Amino acid sequence: MMPLMALGQSNFNLSLIGSFDWPTTEGSDIWGWVNPVDGSEYALVGLNDGFACVNVSNPTNPVQEFYISDINSTWRDVKTWGNFAYITTEADAGLLIVDLTDMTGGTYWHVSNFTHPTNGSSVEFTAAHNLFIDEN
């Protein structure tokens, strides 16, 4: 049993130099974003009970910039487009859109209705397991 455990712990020439713990929740997704103005690097983390933005510019000392509480869900997926983070969940919370230029976490929207692009009708969006953004 011991040789299998040692094999399972291979680090592939990686070293842990910092970490950040959330004592009350678990994560389900992580995505990266770089601030185009100052080059600061951020980990965007989908948590069971919300969304967090962690500054990892100094990887030995990650700092949580903000946290947005949301409906509890095992799955939360994060993607970015420009300076915005888009977060989906299976918890019927719609789409969370966060303006990443506001590091206070105060600029965000929960969206559950969209206007159809061709006929103008309202289209309801409540939940999704995953999110993909076509950059083209």
Predicted stretch roles:
Residues 8-136:
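Feature marking well-ordered beta-strand scaffolds used for ligand recognition
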